[in-house]
Structures are given as C-alpha cells and as structure tokens.
Amino acid sequence: MTSVIRFALLSLCLSPLLLSLLGSQTASAADWPTWRHDAGRSGTTTETLPENLKLAWSRQLATPQPAWPEDPRIGFDLVPEPVVVGRTLYLASTRTDSVTAYDTRTGQLKWKVFADGPIRFAPLVADGKVVFGSDDGCVYAVDAQTGKPVWKFQAAPSS
C-alpha cells in the first residue's frame, strides 16, 4: 500500500479518537495540549504573558524529513509543532521517528519514545497520556510523565 493511502487511512482513524480525547480533558489556559491549542484549533489562549520574556533554553533539532520531498505544495511537516502541558513540552520528529518530552523550565530531557516510522503531526496530551500517530500505521499512547507505553493500535496497514 502506498504511503499516501496509508497516511489517509491513519488520518481518518486517528481524527475521531483524538477529538474525543481532547473534548474530555480540562486544561489550564497556560496549557497547549494539541496543535493550535484546542479542539477548535483556535491558536489562541487567555493566558497573559509577562512583559519581559527571556530565552530560558534552546535545543538544536534535526531538520524535518518531508513526507513528499518532490511536491512543493505539501509542506505541512517542515516545522516541528510542540505541545505543552504543565511543565512539559512534547515534540514529535519525522527525522528520528520519536516523541520527546522536555522540562519547560530547564530544557532537560524527561523521556523519548520511538515509533516504527516518522511522526508527522503534533501529539495530543489528554488524561495523563500522550497520543500520536506514525507513518507505520499505528496510533500510540504513552504515559505523559514517564513515556512508558499504555497502548498501541494498528489503525492502517503498515505496507
């Protein structure tokens, strides 16, 4: 099965699951538990930022690996899309096939988990779990604090 068809199947299966998880959680205004903040993809928050922001830490990330490098119209996975809940930043990677958790205050690595294919979209954090899909056709859930696997679902054929 081509990667485009596998990706479409995974997206169709994953969307209702992620929306149901997101609708069941209660997040503070400071949290950013999914891509563009909330189920409505508003990209806004009521959280007030301090007037004098300062860089606390930074990380050099691997250059993302595009899904279709020959098609200039498809650039959705060229930029990492972090999500933040509490003191943890979660970041998916197409280059390392992983989701990594960092402490937001120190930048220290908390944990890193791997899938069997690139992870092209931001994970979702809900009910103490980090949920993400991979090009391997699977949807994964790991414990948000430890990164330990909670469940794995084969949502689309692997090839």
Regions found by a protein language model. Name each.
Residues A8-S24:
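Bacterial N-terminal signal peptides
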Residues F153, P157-S159:
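Solenoidal tandem-repeat scaffolds enriched in leucines and small polar residues
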Residues A30-P64:
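Blade/loop signatures of beta-propeller domains
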Residues S24-A30:
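Boundary at the C-terminal end of the N-terminal hydrophobic targeting segment
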Residues W32-R36, D71-V99, V113-Y140, P157:
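Repeat-blade elements of multi-bladed beta-propeller folds
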Residues D103-T106, D143-T146:
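Short loop/turn segments that connect beta-strands within beta-propeller blades
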Residues M1-F7:
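N-terminal secretory signal peptides that target proteins for export/translocation
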Residues W57, P66-D71, Q108-V113, W151:
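A short beta-strand motif characteristic of beta-propeller blades
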